[in-house]
Amino acid sequence: MPSSGALKDLSFSQHFRMMVICIVLLQVLLQAVSVAVTYMYFTNEMKQLQDNYSKIGLACFSKTDEDFWDSTDGEILNRPCLQVKRQLYQLIEEVTLRTFQDTISTVPEKQLSTPPLPRGGRPQKVAAHITGITRRSNSALIPISKDGKTLGQKIESWESSRKGHSFLNHVLFRNGELVIEQEGLYYIYSQTYFRFQEAEDASKMVSKDKVRTKQLVQYIYKYTSYPDPIVLMKSARNSCWSRDAEYGLYSIYQGGLFELKKNDRIFVSVTNEHLMDLDQEASFFGAFLIN
């Protein structure tokens, strides 16, 4: 049988072992609690930072930054708002460029071909702008509506030389018409200015409350190889002048894109041509090549 001293040593050893195990378990438990608390703390902090960053990003796009485009790299690094905008614009540029490249790759090479450049390597500027010029007689406006194919009276009183605002670049001018030399898509425009002044004799024949009505119409025509002119645009308005008014001023402007061939001719005609004011700033006609 074991002695009493041996039993005491065995009991002490068991108690010591149990104490060590408890201490180890307690340390593991404390570490687990510490890790859990730390994880929850950092998760909460990250969520708050994410929410704040999202709010800052939304605030960046809800207000305008006028100096964004002029900002340097150093200023952008110091301003989170500008960083967000720059990243977004870079993403938009990448997507746009990728889409453009995909689109270009599907277009036949024939459509992508460009006309040869003239000598010097610079593209020609094809454009014309002619302005009104005070007419010496009524012969400057030629009636052209007798055949029923055109309306109004053709304006020939255009200043075609390089005086004032007028110029011609690779477009000819002949008999009040602009003659196209290069085929392509053109923007054509015209403005006509009307000035009405009641004659004293006529005003006596009209009652005080009565007004005189004039129908003002502007036409832009095109001549092609086809014998009859083709109307491209027209604009109209009914204008009333009061008997008590010293004079009335009205203008008509119109413009549009049209495909023109070589040797096509375009011109302007109007109704009530005797009311036109052919000042260069008031009445003008022109066209320029888009592509």
From Swiss-Prot:
It is found in: Cell membrane; Secreted. The keyword Transmembrane helix applies. Tyrosine phosphorylated by PKDCC/VLK. It holds the Pfam family TNF. Residues 126-290 form the THD domain. The keyword Ribonucleoprotein does not apply. Zn(2+) binds at residue 240. Cytokine that binds to TNFRSF10A/TRAILR1, TNFRSF10B/TRAILR2, TNFRSF10C/TRAILR3, TNFRSF10D/TRAILR4 and possibly also to TNFRSF11B/OPG. Induces apoptosis. Its activity may be modulated by binding to the decoy receptors TNFRSF10C/TRAILR3, TNFRSF10D/TRAILR4 and TNFRSF11B/OPG that cannot induce apoptosis. This is Tumor necrosis factor ligand superfamily member 10.
